[in-house]
Amino acid sequence: MLPNANSRPRRLALADDNTVYYADYSRGFLGRLDLANGQVKEWASPSGPQSQPYGIAFAKGAIWYNESFAKPSTLVRFDPKSESFQTWPFPGGGDIVRNMDVTAGGNVVTANSLVNQVGFVEIR
């Protein structure tokens, strides 16, 4: 059970340290569930409570997700070690990124459903 009854996680990302990250669409939060002890920690998404985070992935030691209601749609990187965020306008507008996955090389691929695109984020 998540600590806030209003949480509505859309997608999950498994990290390499036995934790699960979730994009809380309804509240505009990024959350982490530690599978070893059940503890949950949450961070407000950079664009605020109406940002509607959706697609999410773990790649090269960081969490990547999309704020679907930010205008323009925003690509977010979260560093779990420093607990800090970086943001960029989503290339091509992005709109709602419903799913993200990671290539064998550790880059992020996105499904941008409302703009008929598949995106590629090269992580350097």
How would you name each of these model-derived features?
Residues M1-L2, Q39-S45, S84-F90:
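A short beta-strand motif characteristic of beta-propeller blades
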Residues P3-N18, G48-N66, G93-G105:
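Beta-rich, blade/repeat-based domains predominating
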Residues A5, S26, A36, P49, ...:
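A generic "binding-loop/recognition-motif" signal
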Residues L14, D24, D34, A57-F58, ...:
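Residue-level signal for WD-repeat beta-propeller blades
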Residues V20-S26, I63-A70, T110-L114:
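Conserved beta-strand positions in repeat-built beta-propeller and related beta-rich domains
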Residues F29-R32, S73-V76, Q117-F120:
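A short loop-to-beta-strand structural motif that recurs across blades of beta-propeller domains
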Residues D34-G38, D79-E83, E122-R124:
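Short loop/turn segments that connect beta-strands within beta-propeller blades
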Residues P91-R124:
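Blade-level signature of beta-propeller repeat domains, shared across WD40, Kelch, NHL, RCC1
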